[in-house]
Amino acid sequence: MTPHINAPEGAFADVVLMPGDPLRAKYIAETFLENAKEVTNVRNMLGYTGTYKGRPVSVMGHGMGIPSCSIYTKELITEYGVKKIIRVGSCGAVRNDVKVRDVIIGLGACTDSKVNRIRFKDNDFAAIADFDMTQAAVQAAKAKGINYRVGNLFSADLFYTPDVEMFDVMEKYGILGVEMEAAGIYGVAAEFGAKALSICTVSDHIRTGEQTSSEERQLTFNDMIEIALESVLLGDQA
């Protein structure tokens, strides 16, 4: 057990899918996993372990923002032996060619957070996904006929940012989605010798104002979940 996870030793599979919302973790476990059992519930940050097509897989919420997700990913890796983390979350779009409900595979993650600079002795850290996991996710998306984009995310510290001009900079640099966790998760994975990938669904468009409801975000973003789970199976074959 840890201060934030009350699961016993061995409760987690070596691969954990991590949405921000613990209720989405519950939905994934109940909808996609067989024989799923709740293994942790501290602060109602729910975690489950079951199987997907016979393969052990866990799913657990990580909360909002880099500080929260860094706590959970670090403890899963160092205390429970987790080898791979797949974030399955939502993001906002700033580019006109990126649409609501598009699936984005996060090859890298820029950030305005200083967390990785603290880790990396005040130097810039290239927060990138694991190549094999990225490749497996692309293969899974192609096999299922799911439209996807591959590219950079931006992990922001502020949800309600006053710096709206930064959206123009993000668009110029080709940022596909704005969220709050990927750069932190990639940093934690690198620091502790694990692998990570973020797969996000566009939940709202910052330019147009189009958005999905909280219920839709919790219950209908199935494409990214299927990509993540199928990529786990493909990764086992590599």
UniProtKB/Swiss-Prot annotation:
Record keywords: Glycosyltransferase, Transferase
One annotated GO biological process: purine nucleoside catabolic process
PROSITE patterns in alphabetical order: PNP_UDP_1
Lineage: Bacteria, Pseudomonadati, Pseudomonadota, Gammaproteobacteria, Pasteurellales
Listed Pfam families: PNP_UDP_1
Function: Catalyzes the reversible phosphorolytic breakdown of the N-glycosidic bond in the beta-(deoxy)ribonucleoside molecules, with the formation of the corresponding free purine bases and pentose-1-phosphate.
Protein's name according to its UniProt entry: Purine nucleoside phosphorylase DeoD-type
CDD domains reported for this sequence: PNP_EcPNPI-like (cd09006)
Quaternary structure annotation from Swiss-Prot or TrEMBL: Homohexamer; trimer of homodimers.
Family of this protein: Belongs to the PNP/UDP phosphorylase family.
Binding site residues for a purine D-ribonucleoside: 4, 179-181, 203-204
UniProt-listed Enzyme Commission number(s): 2.4.2.1
Active site as annotated: 204
This protein's GO CC annotations: cytosol
An example molecular function term from Gene Ontology annotations: purine-nucleoside phosphorylase activity
Key word Glycosyltransferase present: yes
Source species of the chain: Mannheimia succiniciproducens (strain KCTC 0769BP / MBEL55E)
HAMAP family for this protein: Pur_nucleosid_phosp (MF_01627)
NCBIfam families: deoD, PRK05819.1, PRK13374.1
